[in-house]
Curated annotation (Swiss-Prot):
HAMAP family: NQOR. This is NAD(P)H dehydrogenase (quinone). It catalyses: a quinone + NADH + H(+) = a quinol + NAD(+); a quinone + NADPH + H(+) = a quinol + NADP(+). It comes from Methanosarcina mazei (strain ATCC BAA-159 / DSM 3647 / Goe1 / Go1 / JCM 11833 / OCM 88) (Methanosarcina frisia). GO terms for molecular function: flavin adenine dinucleotide binding; FMN binding; NAD binding; NADH:ubiquinone reductase (non-electrogenic) activity; NADP binding; NADPH dehydrogenase (quinone) activity.
Amino acid sequence: MVKVNIIFHSVHAHIYRMAEAVAAGAREVEGAEVGIYQVPETLPEDVLEKMGAIETKKLFAHIPVVTRDMYEDVLAGADALIFGTPTRYGMMTAQMRAVLDGLGKLWSEDAFVGKVGSVFTSSGTQHGGQESTILSFHVTLLHLGMVIVGLPYAEKRQTIMNEITGGSPYGASTIAGGDGSRQPSENELEMARYQGRHVTQIAKKIAGK
């Protein structure tokens, strides 16, 4: 059985919806054990309320939060990790960064070497830093010794020109709009499903399972 865990940070549920699509794609692979977790939120409740995020966060309140005592099992114990984060100034969010910065002990034990890593993202605008967010995330995965998998052009949905859409060879993505009102399109969700399936297939081959 190949173990795949999706780790995400979401505020207005865009990344959560993409994460669910990634998980659905991963579950299509025979023998896949798929988990989905969110990272701890570090913003205080009054800030979240001003952002209008209290209600949207309730949509995925049932998703377990990955805490430090779970790192060895949930993170190091997986054959593949697929990370989802909104873009913040062209990089991952501080909430996601905090989890990765807590992996020092496991890194020193080579716990992630040879495991598959992949990333998906969202931004408020079409050119809001999606590619730089994924590529800068890859740097950390390489330091951990992971094998990076993206979204190949075999997934033709990323080449369509008749609608606004996220997606690049680096990973699936969605465009939320400046006010967060745009939800992931079916095209974007299908790319996320493809990425989940593709990553899981490769992880299964690498793990020999």
